[in-house]
C-alpha cells in the first residue's frame, strides 16, 4: 500500500492490494534471527502506512536493527518520539532533487512535506538519510554541491543513490542514465565521500559500488527480498 502514485515506481508493478500481516512479519524476523540475520529493511509501497506494526516489531525484536525506505510524507512528531523510544529504527527518505523536479514525479507538495519531515527528524536527534533515484534528467542536480549541502544542513547522515530502472510496459526508457552518466556517477560518488574535499555525508551507489562487496549481493549472498505476497526473491529489482 502507498499514499502516493509516483511516475515510474517499480514497486507499483506488484499491485496495491498485497500486504504481509504483522504475524507474517514477526514470523519472518523470528526465523531470520535463527539464521543469524539481525538487520531488516522495509520497502513498499510506503512502509509508514504501517507505523504501529513497525514500532511493535522494533519493540519485540529489540536485538535487531530496522531501516525503512519512505517517501517521508507520514513522518510526524509522534512517530519521531516512538523512533526515539525504541532506538532501533532509521529512515531513508526518497528525494529526486529540488522542488520542481521532485514533485514532477512524486506529486505537488511532496517536496515541502519531505523538508518538514527532515526538520522533525533532525530536531529529535534521529539518524536518517536520503534515497535518491538518479535519472538522465536529474543526475547533475542530485550530485551537485548545492543539493548535497542542503540535505546535510537538513540533518542527513547518508544518501543512497539508485539509478532509474525502467519497469513495466509504459516505462520511460529515456530516463535511464547513459553510459557516460553512469561513469560520471562512479567518480562523483567517490569525490563526495572522499577524505579530502568530500562532504560530511556518506554516499553510496547501489549499483556502482558493487566492487566493494564482490559484485551483486543478491540471491542470499548478503541479501534477499521478501515481497508483499510472501515470496522470497533474489532481489527487489528482478520482477
Residue ranges with predicted function:
Residues 12-16, 98-101, 166-169:
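A short, flexible beta-alpha/helix-coil linker loop
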Residues 25-42, 50-162:
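Radical SAM/AdoMet-radical enzyme domain recognition
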Residues 1-22, 236:
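Canonical Radical SAM [4Fe-4S] cluster-binding loop centered on the CxxxCxxC motif
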Residues 103-215, 219, 228-233, 237:
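Radical SAM enzyme [4Fe-4S]-AdoMet core and its adjacent flexible, acidic
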Residues 1-8, 38-42, 230:
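N-terminal pre-triad scaffold of radical SAM enzymes
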